[in-house]
Every structure is written in structure tokens, then in C-alpha cells.
Amino acid sequence: MDGKAPAAFVEPGEFNEVMKRLDKIDEKIEFVNSEVAQKIGKKVGRDIGILYGGFIGLLLFLIYTVVSSMFM
């Protein structure tokens, strides 16, 4: 070899068929990746919601204890 890549000649029909199959595979991969990203997003959203809920609950509890101790 003299450092050149080997060349292959393919009929245009075969080439188009292979490209269509590769496009279908690419669409499936993109779909799976988007589903995985959506699932991760839901988990992160749930965790953030739990943290916000805990923080607001703690804040309400502190306000309640301060207000109730003022009137005793």
C-alpha cells in the first residue's frame, strides 16, 4: 500500500438502501437517547421537588414555633 485508503464502488441503488437503513437506525438511537434523558429529567425534578417541599415545611414549622412562642 502506498498510504491511500482503498476505494470501493457501489451502485447508487445499494448506496441509497444502506443510507435509508442507517437513517432508521439513527432515528431509533435518537429516540432511545431522548427517552433516557426524559427519565433522568423526571428523577431530577422529583428530587428538587422533595427538597423544596422539605425546605418549605421546615420554614413553616419555624414560623409556627416562633409565632406560637410569642403568645405564650
Swiss-Prot record:
Places the protein is found: Cell membrane
Domain of life, per lineage: Archaea
Swiss-Prot/TrEMBL catalytic activity: 5-methyl-5,6,7,8-tetrahydromethanopterin + coenzyme M + 2 Na(+)(in) = 5,6,7,8-tetrahydromethanopterin + methyl-coenzyme M + 2 Na(+)(out)
A GO CC term assigned to this protein in UniProt: plasma membrane
Pathway: One-carbon metabolism; methanogenesis from CO(2); methyl-coenzyme M from 5,10-methylene-5,6,7,8-tetrahydromethanopterin: step 2/2
UniProt KW keywords: Cell membrane, Membrane, Methanogenesis, Methyltransferase, One-carbon metabolism, Transferase, Translocase, Transmembrane, Transmembrane helix
Primary localization: membrane
EC number: 7.2.1.4
Family: Belongs to the MtrG family.
Function as written in the Swiss-Prot or TrEMBL entry: Part of a complex that catalyzes the formation of methyl-coenzyme M and tetrahydromethanopterin from coenzyme M and methyl-tetrahydromethanopterin. This is an energy-conserving, sodium-ion translocating step.
Name the UniProt record assigns to this protein: Tetrahydromethanopterin S-methyltransferase subunit G
Lineage: Archaea, Methanobacteriati, Methanobacteriota, Stenosarchaea group, Methanomicrobia
Originating gene: mtrG
